[in-house]
C-alpha cells in the first residue's frame, strides 16, 4: 500500500511540472480534440524524447507512474488496467495520426500505398512475455494513419510521426518530453522464431510505415533524437503540403523549458542502441549499400535510393534488419575501393540490400532525384530516407550531393552523394574528395593484416580502434664482456682496424694506441674468437714487421745531429763523471730527446705519465740485446746496473704487457765512444744474471708443501705493481727475497754516496713499484765489483736506477751492508709458517658463509687446499694441535665447547687487523705464534658480543632457558679482548701509520720509504709489510699525487654485531607449528 501511495505521489509531482509530460500530437487539430479521458494513463518512468517546437497545451491525465518493482510484478493490477483500457480508448478516439518517435534496429520497408488506398487493416495486439520489465503502451487492433510530409529548404519540415506498435524491448532512456507511446528498442529480430513475435511479423501487422522527421535545423530536430531508417511514402505529397501549412503556424508557438538540455543529451546518445557487437555483425550476411548504413547514424543529410514501381505489387512487408548491415564488405570485399576508416569514400561505397528484403524490392539501380520534379516521382517510386548526424562529419568529411537535394544546413555545404553501385564497383573517382584523402587511406591499408581492426568514425561520436599485429622478434643484443672493455669492437664484434680512435687519443691526452692497434691489425684477428688465439710470440713477430721503421730512422738521424751539442753540454756540466756512465746516459739522453719532441717536459710527477706516448716505444729498437731482453715479458724483473739506464718512458711501458722489444743492435755509436772494460763486464753480468734468474723466479705450487715456499712480501709487491705477468699468483721464491735484500742494500749504499747536487739523484715521486730479483751469486759478484771501483763512475750508473719512478720494494735500511750477514737473512726469511697465515690460503669446509667478503685480497691469490693433503702434511710435520685449525660451524658449537686459554692469552690478537695477516710482528720471537690467529678468530664465537651485551666470563655460560617447547642456550665469553681485535685496531693502525710517516719524513725526504732497516719494518708489523690496504703504497712520501690517504675497507667484526641464541628445537615461537 505504501508503494502504491508513493507511486501516485510521484505521478502527481510529474503532472505539475511545466509541460514536461504532456501529451501532444504533431497534428494540432487532433491534439485539441483530445480530452482528459482519452489521454494516456500510463507514461514511461523515464521522460521520452520530444519535439519542442510543436507543443500543445498540457492535458491532465490519470496517474500512470509506478515504481519499478510494481511494474515488474505480474500481479500489478494498476499496470494491467491502465495500459490496456486507456490505450484502447485513446487509439479508438484518434483516427488521425498521432506522434511517435521510435527507435529500433529493425526497420520496415513496405510498398507505398496508392492515392486511393483505404485505411490499412487494424493491427493485432502484440505478444508480450509476462516477465517483461519494460513499461510501454500496448497498441490495440486499431490502426493509425500516417501523415506524410513534403517540404522544401525554405520551410520547416513536417514533424508528424507515425506510432509504432509496442515491440518487445526496453524503454528508451531520453529526456525532455512525453509522447503518446513510449519509445522501445528492438532487442531481437522480429522475424526470428526465438523472438515469440512471429505473429507480429505477418503481412498485415506493420502496415504503418516509419516516417522520419526530417527537420534538419539545429533548433527543431527530432531526427537528432535517435537514428532510424525511415521510408518516405510519397503517396500523399499534395495532401501533406496542406498539413505543413497548418503546422507552420503552430510549430513555433511555444518552446519547452527543457529544450536545450534535451537537445544536448539527445545528441550525445544518438547511437546508444548500437553496441560494438551490433556494428561488427551488421553486414555479415547483408549486401546493403554502405552509404545507407552510414546515413543511419547521422541525422542532418539524406541519401536517397529510388526503386521502380514494380515493387508496389508485393504484399509482404520488407524488413531491413540493421543488425545485418556490417562493415565487413567495406573492409574485405573487392567491391570497395578504399577503406572506410576516416575516409569520405565511406559514404560513396555501395552495398546491395539485405536478402531479408524480399520479393525483389529495391533491386533497381538507384537514380537521382531532382527537387523540382520530386512530386511526380514520389507517386511512382519509393525513397529510402536515411538521417545523418553531421556533428562529426562537419569536421572530418566533406560530401557532395549529386542528387540535388537540399543542403544539410543553410550555412553548410556538405551534401551526400547518391549511392551508385556501378561507380563504387568500378572504383569511380568522381568524388572530389577522394584524391584528397588518398594518403589517409594508405594508413589503414594494413587493417586486413591484423587479427582485428575496426574503426568507424562518426557513429558514436568517438573512434574505437583495436588492432592486434604480429610483432617480429627483436634482434638479440650483443654485449661485450667487461674484460674487453678497453678493446675496440664494432657492432659485429670485429676489431676496429682504423686509426680513428688512436688519433682521437692523441688529440686529447697526447697518447697513442698505435701499438695496440698494430697488434690488432694482424691477419689472425678476424673475429671475436680470434682474440683468444693470440699470444706474446705473435705480437713479437708483429713488432718486427712494424711499419714505423722509416720514422725510427728519421728520429735516429735527427738525434745524431743534436748528439754532439747534447754531449758537450753534458760534459761541461758534469766534468769527469761521464766516462763509465756514458753508456746509460747516452741511451737516456737519446730517449729523453725523443720524449721532448713529443711531450716537451720531463716527468716530475704522477700526472706527467699521461703525457707519454706509446709511439715512442717503436723507436726503442736501438736498445741492446740484453736490454731488450730485460724489458720483455720473458724477464720477470728489472736488473740494476749500467745497462739498466733506461728512460722513464721505457720502464713505464712495462704496464702494457703486450710490448715486446726486439734485440736490434742499433746501439753501436754509444759503444764506440765508451770502450771501457767495466761496461762490458757489467753488461755480461747483467745478461748472466737475467739468464740465471729466469728459471728460479717462477715457483710452481703443485703440492701442499709447495705453499710454504711462497713469499708473502714478493707476492704482495707483484700483485700491487702488476709486474708479475707470468706469475699468475704473484709468487716469488725465498731466494728471490734474499736477492731483493742484497741488491736493495747495494742501492742504498750507492745512493747515500751520491752527491746531493747531482741532477740525476732526485727520485721521482711516482707510486709505481718494481721488484729486483737478481741471482745471489751474480748479485754478490757484481756488488763486490762495483764496490771496488772508484765510486764516481758507478754513481752515475746507480743514479740511473734511482732516477726511475719506481719504488724499490725492499725490507732493508741500514748504514751497514747486511747482505753479508747470515743473521740478516735468517731474520728476513723466517721459517715457513703453517697455513693459513703463511700461504694466505683458505680452507674450504663447504660452508655457505660470507667467506669471500672477509678476505681483503682477491680470491685469485688464494689456494684451494685439499683437506686430506693438509692432514697428511700436518702428520708429517708433527702438528697435532688441531685446536688451532678448527673452524666453528655456523650455529654448530657444542654446548660444552671450551675455548683454549692459549688462544685467549696470545698477545698477537691485540694488534691483529685481519686474521689472514697475523703473525708478522713477532715472527722472530715465535715463528708459530700466528697459528692461534687463524680463522678461529674470525669464525669462532669466542670474543663476540651476545644479545644482552652484559658481562662475560672466560668460559661459555652453562645456563639455559627452558620454555614450554624449546630450550635456548646462550653463550657468553669475556669481553677483554674484543676491542683489541676489532674497532680499536683500526685506530691503532692509523696512529701507527701516521707516526711512521712522521718518523720517516723528518730526517729523510728523498729516500724511498721502502729502503729502511729491517728492524724498523718488523717493528711496524703488518702495516709496514702488507701495503695493499692502500690503493697507492702507504710508504711513499705524502707529496705524491694522488693522495695516499685513501684506504681500502677491511672487513672486520665490530662490537655492534651479536649472535642469535641457539635454539635446540625447530620452532621459534611457542605458537609456531612444529616440523613433522
From Swiss-Prot:
It comes from the Eukaryota. The modification Phosphoserine is found at residues 275, 354, 403, 407, 632, 676. GO terms for cellular component: cellular bud neck; cellular bud tip; cytoplasm. Keywords: Cytoplasm, Phosphoprotein, Zinc. Residues 93-106 have a biased composition (Low complexity). Residues 118-128 have a biased composition (Pro residues). Residues 419-450 have a biased composition (Acidic residues). Signal peptide: none annotated. It is found in: Cytoplasm; Bud; Bud neck; Bud tip. Residues 1-11 have a biased composition (Basic residues). Residues 1-66, 85-162, 190-223, 234-253, 357-450, 534-557, 566-585, 658-701, 713-762, 909-931, 990-1026, 1041-1076 are annotated as: Disordered. The keyword Phosphoprotein applies. Residues 408-418, 576-585 have a biased composition (Basic and acidic residues). Its main location: cytoplasm. The keyword Transcription does not apply. Residues 23-34, 107-117, 193-206, 214-223, 362-378, 690-701, 739-748, 990-1020 have a biased composition (Polar residues). Induction: Repressed by zinc. Interacts with BUD27, GIS1 and SSD1. Belongs to the ZRG8 family. Involved in the integrity functions of RAM, a conserved signaling network that regulates maintenance of polarized growth and daughter-cell-specific transcription. This is Zinc-regulated protein 8. It comes from Saccharomyces cerevisiae (strain YJM789) (Baker's yeast). The gene is ZRG8.
